[in-house]
C-alpha cells in the first residue's frame, strides 16, 4: 500500500473555458506538478482550443493536446453543425432548478472519454489526481457532471489501473462541484486567473468572440454580474 497522503502531481482537464482555467489555477496552488490536457474533438470552433494553449502558456504548465474525432459520432450541437445551439431563453434557469431534459449541447459520453484519456495520462505522469471542472449547481442538465457520476468514475479508475491495484489511490478532484458561477469567478480571481483569455461561448467565432445568447454565455453573464467583478469580461 502507498504510504503517501499528500497529493503531488495532477492532471487537469483544460477546455479553455471559465471553469477549467479556474481548476488549473486551483491545481497549481494545491499540487507540486501539474499537467494540463485539452482535446481537439471535432468541436464547432478551435477558438476554445487556442484559448487553452494561451492559458497553459500563461500558467507555465505542461500542456498536452489529444485529437479525438467525436464529430464522427454526432449527436450534439457542439459537434454537429447541422444542429442548432439554442438560446438561453429556451432553457429554464429559474430558482436554479435543472430541466429534466438533457440539452442538445450535451456531447454523448464526452466526460467519460476525456476522463479516460486523463486517467491514462495520470498513470504515465505518476499523478494521483485528475482535476475536472464539473459543477452540480449550474450544470445545465448534463448527466456526466453529477457527483454520483464522479464517484463512480473514481471507483472504476482505482479498479482499472496499475496504480490503483498497487494501492496508489487516484482521486478525481472537483473543486467547483458545489460552487455557483459567481463563487467560481471569485475563486479564480483570488488565484490570479485572467478570464480575458477564456472562451465560454458555445457559438464563439474563430476569434473566440461570444454570441452573448447561448446557455454558456448566460451562465457566464450571471456569474460576473453576481460576483460584481469586471463586467467587461462578460461577453469575452
How should these model regions be labeled?
Residues 2-191:
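ATP-dependent adenylation/nucleotidyltransferase module used to activate substrates
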Residues 66-68, 194-203:
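Conserved S-adenosyl-L-methionine
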Residues 129, 164, 195, 225-228:
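Secondary-structure transition/capping residues
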Residues 199-222:
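Local cysteine-cluster metal-coordination motifs and their immediate loop/turn environment
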Residues 213, 223-232:
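Short cysteine/histidine-rich zinc-coordinating motifs and their immediately flanking basic loops
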Residues 234-236:
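Conserved small/polar residues in nucleotide/adenosyl-binding loops
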